[in-house]
Amino acid sequence: MMDAVSPSQDIVRALAVDYCEGIHFSRRDVFEKMCHEKFLMTAVTGSGGVQFWDKAAYLERVAGRDAFPGQPGYEILSVDVAGDEIARVHLWVDVPPRRFEDHLGFVRVGGEWQLMTKVFRTLDGPVLEG
């Protein structure tokens, strides 16, 4: 017997789609609303180090480039919701010339799901260095 998909799981999956499309189309407004004020993004570099960005730095990154041509490339690999308060999304998303593997952590604050953490690595293409 399959478990029913919870309404929160549908909402978090829709946020993951918005996230991928927001990256592709350079939609700063999507991330202004989606990201918690204490959002933190962590990249694993090719040399095994890490780079960090807070919400302001991430918004600047998104706004600082043009949208990519064509349709977004991404796949949502899994969505897990626990206790209707926390959720995790595992996905890959194309950010030409790279494909990134992302693990997104969401929290439900004041009844709204917000992106709290993003931990990612380069899956294909030139690795990030910092």
Description of each model-found segment:
Residues 35, 93-95, 119-120:
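Short beta-strand segments enriched in hydrophobic/aromatic residues
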Residues 99-129:
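Short beta-strand edge/turn micro-motifs at domain boundaries
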Residues 37, 84-85, 111-112:
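Beta-strand-connecting loop/turn residues
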Residues 4-11, 40-47, 51-99:
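Surface-exposed, charged secondary-structure patches
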